Amino acid sequence: MSARLVDDLPRPSGVPGLRVWLKSSGYARRLLLGEAGDPWESAPRFLSFFTQAHGLLRPDVAVVDVGDLYRSWVARHPALKAEMAAKSRVAFPLRRMLEEEGPRKLLTEVVEAVAASLRGQTPLVLALPAPRRWLTEAAGFAGRTAVTVDTDAVESAALYMADFVRVVGALPIGGLLLEEDEAASDGDLEATRPLVNVARHYRWGLALRGQAAAGSDELDSLIGAAPVAGGDLAQGLDVSQELWSGAPVAELGAGQFYFAEIPEGAEPESVLQQLSRLRA
């Protein structure tokens, strides 16, 4: 395994690579810290949490969930919520949130600590909500229950996010994962150009969990429930639903790997059994 995500991705040409990518922060938090536990209170606390979770689950990708960082920070700093609500522009809450110095400093400390613990053996990936999704979430933090997000707002969000991730540009990050939701639009990937440019500048791999159409050639990996034909794109088969329902899981083809989100309330014995299915 390598510190760079692109070096570890399988390719349709037959080049082997990683096999199991997990989204496990909610499950690991409940299991290791309890229902109310928060690993983001400090960098040492997060490192302890991360090393325990990583040792238990042994994923092929080490993920730091930046969305979780900000959910924790906003919950612990109510004054920031008020500042995020100060202006009516749809992108302002996200802009104000990402400008906050405290989370930037904490993320830098966490990435430094986690990267040192990995020692270049596993790619370190920052997982972020995709711009449209993060706009909506930040608006919710600011008390806005309904917002209309157009392509211009998505482009603005991508600019703010690109500026934000530069804070860790000098650190050994292997890639970025953008996670969409059901509100994603066909033009969203093209609107994320600032993030694409930053990823290319720092030689980070770029993965998307969602449904990409136009612009998918900008990605190194696309993660979804159904494979996409053509190209040299590494494809993550999202088997979360099948895995935890006990349904059969598709065999991997060339250039494919498994992606699974572990339910927060899953039983540890069941989790280890199901992960064994993916690794068999």
Where are these regions (language model features)?
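Generic structural signal for well-ordered alpha-helices
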Residues: V6-L9, L47-H54, L107-A115, A162-V165, ...
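Catalytic-face loop-and-helix region of soluble metabolic enzyme cores
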Residues: R209-A280
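Active-site-proximal, glycine-rich beta->alpha crossover segments in alpha/beta enzymes
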Residues: V74-V167
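A cross-domain feature marking catalytic cores of carbohydrate-active enzymes
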Residues: S24-G26, V66, L126-A130, E180, ...
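Short, well-ordered coil/turn segments that N-cap beta-strands
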Residues: G14-L18, L56-V61, R119-L124, P172-G174, ...
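A contiguous, surface-oriented mixed alpha/beta subdomain in the mid-to-C-terminal portion of proteins
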Residues: V149, A162-A225
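N-terminal basic, low-complexity leaders that serve as flexible interaction/assembly modules and, when applicable
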Residues: M1-R71, F257-A280
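Glycine-rich, proline-tolerant flexible connector loops at the mouths of alpha/beta enzymes
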Residues: S42-A43, V61-G102, G175-D186
